[in-house]
C-alpha cells in the first residue's frame, strides 16, 4: 500500500553501535546542523558541491526548510536529518530525491555522515531505513545512488545494503567545483 507521508515522518534503523532516527529537518535543528557542517566542511569537501558561509545562515536554512516542506507535501522528495538515537545527536543527513512516479516508480538517494560518526554503521542503518521507506511506504520499485569511484566508504555502505553497480555516468555531478564521473548503484524492491 502506498501512503503519502507527512512532514512529520520519522524513520528508525539499527547500526552496530546502536540505532539511528531519521526525521525531517526542523528549525530547532539549525544550530546543531550549522555546527556539524562547519566541523565537517573539509572532510566532506571532496564529495559535495561547493558551498560557502552563506549556506550556513539562518535565512538560507529557513529557505531550505520551506523548499523541503513543499517537496514533501508534493511527494517529490523526503529530506531527513540523521540522529544517533542514544543521545539524539545530529550526525548527518539522508535525502530521498527526484521521486518519479508513473512507469518509473524510482528515486535517488544521497547521504552523508560527520567524520566523528563515520565507519560505525550509522550510514548503513540510515540507508537501510531510507530504502525500506521507499519500498514499503512510498511503493517505489527502484532506488538509485551515485558515488565517486574513490569514495570507498560509501561504496561499501551501498554494497552492504544490497545495491548493485550498474555502470559509470560521465561528468555526472559538479562536485567540489569540478565535473566528476560517478558510479551508479541501484537497489530494486525485489532485491
Show where each model-derived region lies:
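Acyl-donor (CoA/ACP) binding surface of acyl/acetyltransferases
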Residues: 1-32, 36-46, 79-191
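Conserved GNAT-fold acetyl-CoA-binding loop/helix
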Residues: 45-66
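Short loop/turn motifs at secondary-structure junctions and domain boundaries
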Residues: 70-75, 163
Amino acid at each position: 500500500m502506498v501512503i503519502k507521508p507527512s512532514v512529520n515522518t520519522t524513520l528508525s534503523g539499527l547500526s552496530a553501535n546502536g540505532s539511528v532516527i531519521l526525521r525531517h529537518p526542523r528549525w530547532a535543528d539549525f544550530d546543531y546542523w550549522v555546527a556539524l557542517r562547519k566541523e565537517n566542511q573539509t572532510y566532506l569537501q571532496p564529495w559535495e558541491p561547493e558551498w560557502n558561509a552563506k549556506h550556513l545562515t539562518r535565512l538560507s536554512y529557513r529557505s531550505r526548510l520551506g523548499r523541503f516542506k513543499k517537496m514533501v507535501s508534493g511527494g517529490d522528495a523526503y529530506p531527513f536529518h540523521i540522529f544517533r538515537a542514544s543521545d539524539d545527536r545530529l550526525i548527518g543527513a539522508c535525502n530521498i530525491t527526484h521521486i518519479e512516479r508513473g512507469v518509473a516508480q524510482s528515486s535517488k538517494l544521497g547521504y552523508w555522515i560527520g567524520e566523528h560518526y563515520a565507519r560505525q554503521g550509522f550510514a548503513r542503518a540510515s540507508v537501510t531505513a531510507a530504502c525500506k521507506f521507499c519500498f514499503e511506504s512510498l511503493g517505489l520499485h527502484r532506488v538509485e545512488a551515485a558515488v565517486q569511484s574513490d569514495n570507498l566508504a560509501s561504496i561499501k555502505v551501498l554494497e552492504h545494503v544490497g545495491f548493485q553497480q550498474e555502470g559509470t555516468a560521465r561528468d555526472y555531478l559538479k562536485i567540489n567545483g569540478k565535473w566528476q564521473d560517478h558510479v551508479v548503484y541501484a537497489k530494486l524492491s525485489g532485491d
